[in-house]
A protein has these predicted regions:
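Anion-binding alpha/beta catalytic cores of soluble intermediary-metabolism enzymes, centered on
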Residues: 1-93, 97-101, 106-168
Length: 168
C-alpha cells in the first residue's frame, strides 16, 4: 500500500488496476485519473502527473487500458456536468471502468463516502504483490470481507492462467 505514490508507483497502480479489471472480463478497461480539476494546473501536482501519465501511456503503453485525465469527479460520473462544462470525453457520465485516485487519502475518502452516502458494498485487496492480499476496513462487515476474499481468489486464478499461457 502506497500512501503518496510517485510516478513509477502510479504506473504500477494503473497496470495492477487494469489487470484486476481484465481478470473480471473487462477487455480494454477505461481508467480515469481523478483530480480536483480537469485542466492541468501547475500549482496542482496531481494534474501535471495525470497529464504526463496519459501522454506516456499513448507514446509507450505501460498498461493494457485506456487512460484519461486529469478529470474531476463530477465529469467521471455525470454527462450533464460534462455538457455544462463543454468537456469532451467519450466515457464521462459513467463510462469509466475504474478510478485511479492521486493518493491513498483521496481514495479512502472516496470509498468511505460511497459506503456511507450510497450504501455501496465494497471489497478490498492489495494487488501487485506476489499474491493478492485481502484488505478491508476495520468497519467492514462479513459480506465485504467475503467479497474481498472472492476477489483475491478470482484474481489469483486469472494470474495463474495468464502465467500458464505465457502472458505477463
Amino acid at each position: 500500500v502506497v500512501i503518496k505514490p510517485n510516478m513509477t508507483q502510479k504506473k504500477a497502480i494503473i497496470k495492477n488496476t487494469a489487470d484486476a479489471l481484465k481478470a473480471f472480463g473487462y477487455e480494454n478497461p477505461k481508467l480515469a485519473l481523478l483530480s480536483l480539476v480537469e485542466k492541468v494546473t501547475f500549482h496542482m501536482q496531481d494534474t501535471v502527473e495525470a497529464q504526463r501519465l496519459v501522454s506516456e501511456q499513448k507514446q509507450r503503453p505501460f498498461a493494457d487500458c485506456e487512460l484519461w485525465g486529469p478529470i474531476a469527479y463530477d465529469l467521471i460520473l455525470s454527462k450533464e456536468a460534462a455538457r455544462l462544462k463543454n468537456y469532451d470525453c467519450p466515457w464521462s457520465g459513467g463510462g469509466f471502468d475504474g478510478i485511479i485516485a492521486p493518493d491513498l487519502s483521496t481514495a479512502n475518502t472516496l470509498v468511505k463516502s460511497w459506503l456511507i452516502h450510497a450504501h455501496a458494498v465494497t471489497c478490498g485487496a492489495v494487488v501487485g504483490a506476489r499474491v493478492p492480499i485481502a484488505l478491508t476496513s476495520r468497519s467492514a462487515n462479513e459480506e465485504e470481507t467475503y467479497l474481498s476474499l472472492v476477489f483475491c481468489a478470482v484474481l489469483d486464478a486469472w494470474r495463474k492462467k495468464c502465467k500458464a499461457e505465457g502472458q505477463s
